Amino acid sequence: MNNEFELKQLWQSEESIAHIHGWDFSHIHGRYEEGNDIPWNYEEIIRQYLTSDARILDFDTGGGEFLLSLHHPYKNTAATEGFPPNVQLCKETLLPLGIDFKECSDAANIPFEDESFDIIINRHGDFNAKELHRLLKKGGLFITQQVGSENDRELVEMVLPGTPKQFPDLNLTKQQKVFEEAGFEILQAEEAFLPIKFYDVGAFVWFARIIEWEFPGFSVDKCFDKLLAMQKTIEEQGEVAGTTHRYLIVARK
């Protein structure tokens, strides 16, 4: 094992630069691998339903990168975001295009009128089924890909054993019921558990600081012994591995 002092300095360096622009994980590209073979294609599903005259809202758009990739007519496009650095980014990139962007961090109070949208999309963001029902036109669709409650749990246990699940109800069975009770018809519902692997501890440190809600209270100082154990595993096995949890819901009002 490398000198512990040097490792700690290296990991603290990763910790200090754990900031992202939009939702950009390029800093650890090649140093980790996340299962991309999800058995559905979120973008293709959206395009299946999207017509040029449809009014679409991307709630919790991040930096707007995915929304812009759809190339939907800007006059029929709206977006919200609540994370301050991303809000500023959206103001700089989306508003000049004519996209109806509004700052919003409360999924139960979205600042648009009743029945404003034909399609609402949301990837890995918050949502409130009753509020979505209010915002959608009759026959309108909500399409979401979500991170489930079991996401990265093995990795959390490696460094913060005993940490409670932050959102225990985020799974397909419970959320499908929530949407049905809110008056939606479920058109598609799928769930997937896929591997995530880290090839160096520094990449994991950066990741854990970015995904701070999954790793509450994590720091190199606090978890140093656990990180050393992770380092040993990587030296012996070439990686540390966990599991991602994703689910998809397409619901019609």
Label every PLM stretch briefly.
Residues 160-174, 215-217:
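Acceptor-substrate binding/catalytic loop of class I
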Residues 185-253:
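Conserved Class I S-adenosyl-L-methionine
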